[in-house]
């Protein structure tokens, strides 16, 4: 990159935006393990809420799992941020019930922007029934689903999304499809339901894919806002692949490589369903 381009980026404030913290995020370290991209997802979601000007009417429903403490990091009182900005609402849901809680909030306050933020154990295991029926009913919420192919918070047990032959504490010799079944592909499954209006799978492996993930989350939020205005219904799903260096016993770079080379074979990236024009 030449000096003129670097200067242009600096003049446009690109470096400051990349290094800055969105105003709705508290100025504190997160609990996420080193090398985990959960906090990157949290940051781009917060950036979008700020950029779209929807903080005062947004409610995020947090799960049980690695993101259980997400509510610690977002501001809730106007006094914690600029007086003209405000914070978002947060709700901590019982294990697997985030989409059910989000449904209740949305039905009681249909003009709010409601986001459920869940991992694969919460969304695709104990919460499978809630997830499927929320999408089948076409509840007007945006669901962010983190798929790291393992139970992260509880110590690395096999998840519904664990890959064939992938090792975990409960499959120390690797997952065998014959005895343990295969990975559940939530995007593919939920996109068959009439109530699902948008489903896309993205990854957090490099800058290009992170920007694609941000665009996908923005699309899901835009659809919800459009439905709020028009009275239409439909649920949006953004599935995000990311690594778990701690429980995979890998370094961050190796975990990103595993996502890019192995996980995407089992969980292809792309748009599986989008609104009809």
Report each predicted region and the residues it spans.
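Cofactor-binding active-site loop characterized by glycine-rich and histidine/acidic residues
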Residues: 2-142, 161-163
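Short acidic/glycine-rich loop or secondary-structure boundary segments that cap or lie
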Residues: 70, 152-154, 208-211, 245-249
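Structural motif
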Residues: 58-60, 112-116, 140-145, 188, ...
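Glycine-rich beta-alpha junction loops
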Residues: 64-66, 148-150, 206, 240-247
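Conserved thiamine diphosphate
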Residues: 20, 111, 159-226
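A short, conserved beta-to-alpha structural element at the edge of catalytic cores
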Residues: 139-160
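Flexible, low-complexity linker and terminal segments
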Residues: 1-18, 22, 27-28, 225-234, ...
């Amino acid at each position: 990159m030449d000096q003129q381009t670097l200067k242009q980026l600096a003049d446009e404030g690109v470096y400051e935006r990349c290094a800055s913290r969105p105003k709705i995020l508290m100025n504190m370290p997160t609990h996420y393990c080193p090398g985990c991209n959960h906090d990157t997802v949290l940051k781009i979601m917060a950036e979008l809420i700020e950029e779209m000007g929807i903080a005062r009417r947004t409610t995020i429903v947090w799960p049980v799992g690695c993101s259980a403490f997400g509510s610690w990091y977002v501001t809730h009182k106007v006094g914690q941020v600029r007086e003209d900005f405000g914070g978002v609402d947060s709700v901590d849901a019982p294990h697997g019930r985030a989409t059910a809680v989000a449904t209740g909030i949305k039905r009681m306050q249909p003009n709010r922007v409601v986001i459920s933020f869940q991992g694969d154990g919460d969304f695709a295991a104990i919460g499978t029934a809630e997830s499927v029926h929320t999408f089948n009913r076409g509840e007007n919420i945006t669901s962010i689903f983190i798929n790291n192919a393992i139970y992260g918070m509880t110590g690395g047990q096999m998840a519904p999304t664990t890959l064939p032959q992938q090792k975990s504490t409960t499959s120390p010799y690797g997952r065998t499809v014959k005895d343990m079944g295969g990975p559940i592909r939530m995007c593919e499954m939920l996109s068959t339901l009439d109530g699902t209006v948008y489903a896309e799978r993205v990854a957090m492996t490099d800058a290009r894919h992170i920007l694609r993930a941000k665009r996908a989350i923005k699309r899901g939020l835009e659809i919800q806002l459009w439905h709020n205005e028009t009275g239409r219904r439909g649920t949006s799903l953004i599935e995000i692949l990311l690594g778990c260096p701690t429980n995979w016993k890998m370094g961050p770079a190796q975990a990103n490589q595993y996502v890019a080379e192995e996980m995407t074979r089992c969980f292809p990236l792309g748009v599986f369903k989008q609104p009809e024009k």
